[in-house]
Amino acid sequence: MEEFQRYFELNRYQQHNFLYPLIFQEYIAALAHDHGLNRSILLENTGYGNKFSLLSVKRLITQMYQQNHLIISANDSSQNQFFGHNKNLYSQMISEGFAVIVEIPFSLRLRSSLEGKEIVKSQNLQSIHSIFPFLEDKFLHLNYVLDILIPYPIHLEILVQTLRHWVKDASSLHLLRFFLHEYRNWNSLITPKKTSSSFSKRNQRLFFFLYNSHVCEYESIFIFILSQSSHLRSTSSGALLERIYFYGKIEHSVEVFAKDFPSILCLLKDPFIHYLRYQGKSILASKGTPLLMNKWKYYLVNSWQCHFYVWSQSRRIYINQLSNHFLDFLGYLSSVRLNPSMVRSQMLENSFLIDNAIKKFETIVPIIPLIGSLAKAKFCNVLGHPISKPVWADLSDSDIIDRFGRICRNLSHYHSGSSKKKSLYRIKYILRLSCARTLARKHKSTVRAFLKMKRVGSELLEKFFTEEEQVFSLTFPRVSSTSTSRGLYRRRIWYLDIICINDLANHE
């Protein structure tokens, strides 16, 4: 119990008293304006150690500004909203600048938590594909899964309370309240099916940071219970646990929680349990019984409502059996299927037939939502029939082919982990024919006549069929034989360099 209480001690020495003056510096506005900022820069600045003072934050921001050479050219003024007359311009710049500032201490803590760990390349943990090998390895031995829709706070002030115990600058907190009340429908960021305003689209960085910080508050205690009740230990989860910090609102819940911890641990004892979170959903998979999963379900609901001021209902958590359920997340439909097989056993004069079912983890590309995304982007109709892209007809032939080829390669790269490539081949066919029809529309010809053109037709085929195989051969240079290469190409391949979901792949 002493170890448990020490685990929940607050880190009050890491308090930044005056962040407000930094927001209005010129280099902050430049950093906030650069939407292509490489966040790995925050982890590559090694000269500051564990110093979380205002001066170190300011030096880091200055260094980031100098490294990226974010000089706004006057030539871009006609095309860039930075110089436009938008009523939300200044609130956008300031909110993005605020997000840049508050992200730096968290990035420094992440780097310090990874030091000394057996993680060679921590950036691989940031890849979206890194979760699928974990599922493939672990879910074969599990039976049930909880599909959880993460609740959102009942009041915007709760998001401010998340930061107020390490940011003592009242001006910054008042400014944060201004952003939150200007955008009242902030929870539509977490539930993408709802409509969102233009302000939300320009300030997603700040809102996602606040939302993740708030989720980590109550998620931390939950993960701690999992680590104590399970026999499993993971280096990656250990590193993630150390980057979580607990604030004032948890003090009361910790006091109550510490008294009931032995009974809770006994109630929810499960030697094999796994947890993962993505966007506004999370998954809790277990080898236990439906009764145990119901206990977890009602414990989560009561914990959210009683201790963290988060409104939730039991109907937002679904209990499903892995063998009869598809996990719909991150652009894939994942499931655990039983492959039946029959073995004949011969003993002396008698023979027996033995049924042997083998579990197999499958990941499938959901073709219908993906075709819907292509139809929304005007590459095909709702039935999946390719159509031309009129808005690109004014571009050069090479630019049109490059754009279609880039989309096709990105989708193939992201969905390379699919167990069945048939759906992916159909998507490539739609894009290829849409490209041909766009070029034929530009040249006022038919698709058949256009494809007979030797130069353009061969270039089109080369873009869509040979370039992907060239990238594959560069990824696996030791694969020499053609048959071996084709067999490996048909298998699931997970890449550890994918840190964002393609817009066409994100159909949730």
From Swiss-Prot:
One of its GO terms (molecular function) is RNA binding. The keyword Nucleotide-binding does not apply. It comes from the Eukaryota. Keywords: Chloroplast, mRNA processing, Plastid, RNA-binding, tRNA processing. It is found in: Plastid, Chloroplast. GO terms for cellular component: chloroplast. The keyword tRNA processing applies. InterPro entries: Domain_X, Maturase_MatK, Maturase_MatK_N. Disulfide bonds: none annotated. GO terms for biological process: mRNA processing; RNA splicing; tRNA processing. Its main location: plastid. Belongs to the intron maturase 2 family. MatK subfamily. Usually encoded in the trnK tRNA gene intron. Probably assists in splicing its own and other chloroplast group II introns. This is Maturase K. It comes from Huidobria chilensis. The gene is matK.
